Curated annotation (Swiss-Prot):
One of its GO terms (cellular component) is mitochondrion. The gene is mEFG1. It is found in: Mitochondrion. The keyword Nucleotide-binding applies. It comes from the Eukaryota. Its main location: mitochondrion. InterPro entries: EFG_II, EFG_III, EFG_III/V, EFG_IV, EFG_V, EFG_V-like, EFTu-like_2, G_TR_CS. Disulfide bonds: none annotated. Mitochondrial GTPase that catalyzes the GTP-dependent ribosomal translocation step during translation elongation. During this step, the ribosome changes from the pre-translocational (PRE) to the post-translocational (POST) state as the newly formed A-site-bound peptidyl-tRNA and P-site-bound deacylated tRNA move to the P and E sites, respectively. Catalyzes the coordinated movement of the two tRNA molecules, the mRNA and conformational changes in the ribosome. Pathway: Protein biosynthesis; polypeptide chain elongation. This is Elongation factor G, mitochondrial. Keywords: Elongation factor, GTP-binding, Mitochondrion, Nucleotide-binding, Protein biosynthesis. Belongs to the TRAFAC class translation factor GTPase superfamily. Classic translation factor GTPase family. EF-G/EF-2 subfamily.
Length: 745
């Protein structure tokens, strides 16, 4: 037998032995992945966290230990393969997750659907979409970084959609790791009723395993890749701490769970099952967060985390999902969807993500009720369009596996469906049922964009059409004033990634201009109007009169526009009111102070007048235009700017310089904290003052400082900033400055 043959057969034997050992350890074969399970044996989970907390590495380990992939690769690995879930070339190159990726796997005969989401604030809509359709989540925290800005954002998103979660403190192997500090931050910053259900046996380079406080056992991860799990007694030097932490766990649980609370007050002994049942009840009700520990990179703590997903996170039947039946002139009627996997109720599904695949548009959906089979017809509740299902697929990152049917609780994808993110699909178009859509934040940064070569215009148009459809936070428009094409998004990185994708995926290199902030204009106080639009010069004319008031909305609603019809009687016929609203919303697209959109304003239509022949919807729309111009002249206006939450981490010796630079950029310091030679400062800074900060921070901290920022709210500009914005706008329009204009008059 030749050496090559021997090597090959040896390799096959090794692989077979590896797979046999997988089977012995309770791992599953690939043939079982697509089996349909009863509802108790399904989990839909997301893995979310701040950037660089180890989400994708953790997902890679989960897929390996469950037998879904045969070998592991690192996010920035030396083998240049990259993690399974980072399928986009750009993700592997940058070592960050840009799109949420879906997969499914099997652990202890339970089907787990997993969505790995980005941690960078610029891709926050990906997290938003994932959490909307999931039943539970794993919140990954870095044992060194702790609770960071994007952790707080993800926490708010989980609260918005009522998603129960487990916390996993990762990276115990890193220098400076301190899981106890992370737990105290979870309690103080995130207001979680949280406690350890595991403790680390050593940290940094001494990380040997974990202590399970529920079972009161030590767990060690041995063999290649930590696949052999060994249970042992708790080390002697950790027994006192383990007892104290177990007591702390029981106290926190007793405060949140009535059943366990009664046992605690009666001082009755607890069994392992009592604690597990209380953990499950409180976790599903979001009254307690179990905290697990480990290091995904060093293969410790992942299998117990999978057990916790099964033990403590809900199955689709334990989560209440609501549909809304629209009724004319009434509030929508709430309907609880039936999660049973028997197919008795009509199909209801929600499209939560669109993607252009190799075979056309791919639409990710979650089935909430009923069953969907190949060949069925479904209807889009928003457009009422019929779609015939030619192909059903389940996804494993960028690979697809065909299935014949999907049931309530499944996450799947369809091809060639014309829809938008957040659309509801049903098999019965007559019931007018729709589900709550997905919250989409407003873009805060704009940049001019143009293709480098005019011959690439077609590809440029295709890329823009695809990306704006896939990502609701990526907007595209043409500015007639400066004759420029603009794109807007959640940050500079967001827009840079799309520019790079245009070049890579469409062969269309583009040039991005300087970032522009999405300012807004709003009223300072109420302003009344009484406007008559009259145009009569033979034949049918135009006549419309509107009376009312425009007033500012509260600061918490300053990104919204409201229209209220307060008319009584027939002075303004009801069929013309939509014309008034349309005119108001058209004028709100561009203010007269600085050319930015209006927001934070309520338009109250109170009275008016019409002509029996000459009045029309168009006339009332033009009257609305005139009324708003009148308010621009008579009202008091101010400019709003986006305020960012900024978090800077750097060595202690640079604290003075960092805080000085933030103050110089009109920042308000909201808090600081320090740990072992490093400090973190939290501040609120106007986005307009944050451009170029990355370079300044690098130079002032010898390259050791790093920062993250996320959108917080809109707030009024400083007077000198407002004057500067108004002056720049007037110069760009070729208008004289106000004082010069007065001299001419």
């Amino acid at each position: 037998m030749s050496l090559i043959t021997r090597l090959l057969t040896g390799n096959i034997t090794l692989r077979r032995r590896a797979m046999e050992s997988l089977g012995k350890a309770g791992y599953s074969s690939h043939a079982k992945f697509s089996e349909h399970k009863p509802i108790e044996r399904i989990r839909n989970i997301g893995i979310s966290a701040h950037i660089d907390s180890g989400k994708t590495t953790l997902t890679e380990r989960i897929l390996f230990y469950t037998g879904r992939i045969a070998e592991m690769h690192e996010v920035r690995g030396k083998d240049n393969v990259g993690a399974t879930m980072d399928s986009m070339e750009l993700e592997r190159q940058r070592g960050i997750t840009i799109q949420s990726a879906a997969t499914y796997t099997l652990w202890k005969d339970t089907n787990i659907n997993i969505i790995d989401t980005p941690g960078h604030v610029d891709f926050t809509v990906e997290v938003e979409r994932a959490l909307r359709v999931l039943d539970g989540a794993v919140l990954v925290l870095c044992a060194v970084g702790g609770v960071q800005s994007q952790t707080l954002t993800v926490n708010r998103q989980m609260k918005r959609y009522n998603v129960p979660c487990l916390a996993f403190i990762n990276k115990l192997d890193r220098l400076g790791s301190n899981p106890y500090r992370v737990l105290s931050q979870m309690r103080s910053k995130m207001n979680h009723n949280a406690a350890f259900i595991q403790l680390p046996i050593g940290v940094e380079s001494n990380c040997k395993g974990i202590v399970d406080l529920v079972r009161e056992k030590a767990i060690y991860f041995e063999g290649e890749h930590g696949m052999d799990i060994r249970l042992d007694e708790i080390p002697q030097d950790m027994r006192v701490e383990s007892l104290e932490r177990r007591q702390e766990l029981i106290e926190h649980l007793s405060n949140a769970d009535e059943t366990l609370g009664e046992l605690f007050l009666e001082e009755k002994p607890f069994t392992e099952d009592d604690i597990k049942a209380a953990l499950r009840r409180t976790c599903i009700n979001r009254t307690f967060t179990p905290v697990l520990v480990g290091t995904a990179l060093k293969n410790k703590g992942v299998q117990p985390l999978l057990d916790a997903v099964l033990d403590y996170l809900p199955n689709p039947g334990e989560v209440e999902n609501l549909g809304f039946i629209e009724k004319e002139g009434q509030d929508p009627e709430k309907v609880v969807l039936n999660p049973a996997r028997d197919g008795k109720d009509p199909f209801v599904g929600l499209a939560f993500k669109l993607e252009a695949g190799r075979f056309g548009q791919l639409t990710y959906l979650r089935c909430y009720q009923g069953v969907l089979r190949k060949g069925d017809n479904i209807f889009n509740a928003r457009t009422n369009k019929k779609v015939r299902i030619a192909r059903l697929v389940r996804l494993h990152s960028n690979q697809m596996e065909d299935v014949n049917e999907v049931y309530a609780g499944d996450i799947f994808a369809l091809f060639g469906v014309d829809c938008a993110s957040g659309d509801t699909f049903t098999t019965n178009p007559k019931n007018n049922l729709s589900m709550e859509s997905i919250f989409v934040p407003e873009p805060v940064v704009s940049m001019a964009i143009k293709p480098n070569n005019t011959k690439d215009r077609d590809n440029f148009s295709k890329a823009i059409a695809r990306f704006t459809k896939e990502d609701p936070t990526f907007h595209f428009f043409f500015d007639n004033d400066v004759k420029e094409t603009l794109v807007s998004g959640m940050g500079e990185l967001h827009l840079e990634i799309y520019a790079q994708r245009m070049e890579r995926e469409y062969g269309c290199p583009v040039t991005l201009g300087k970032p522009k902030v999405a300012f807004r204009e709003t009223l300072v106080g109420p302003c009344e109007f009484d406007y008559l639009h009259k145009k009569q010069s033979g034949g049918s004319g135009q006549y419309a009169r509107i009376i009312g008031v425009m007033e500012p909305l509260p600061p918490t609603q300053n990104t919204l526009l409201e229209f209220v019809d307060e008319t009584v009687g027939t002075n303004v016929p009801k069929q013309f009111v939509p014309g008034v609203e349309k005119g108001y919303r058209e004028m709100a697209e561009k203010g007269m102070l600085s050319g930015h959109k209006l927001s934070g304003i309520r338009f109250r239509l109170q009275d008016g007048g019409h002509h029996i022949v000459d009045s029309s919807e168009l006339a009332f729309m033009l009257a609305s235009h005139g009324a708003i111009k009148e308010v621009f002249q008579n009202g008091s206006w101010q400019i709003l700017e986006p305020i960012m939450l900024v978090e800077v981490t750097a060595p202690e010796e640079f604290q003075g310089a960092v805080m000085g630079h933030l103050s110089k950029r009109h920042g308000i310091i909201t808090g600081t904290e320090g740990t072992e030679g490093w400090f973190t400062v939290y501040a609120e800074v106007p986005l307009n003052d944050m451009f170029g900060y990355a370079g300044e921070l690098r130079s002032s901290t010898q390259g050791k400082g790093e920062f993250t920022m996320e959108y917080s709210r809109y707030s009024p500009c400083l007077p000198d900033v407002q004057d500067q914005i108004v002056r720049q706008y007037q110069e760009s329009q070729g208008l004289a400055q106000p004082d010069k204009k007065k001299k001419k008059n």
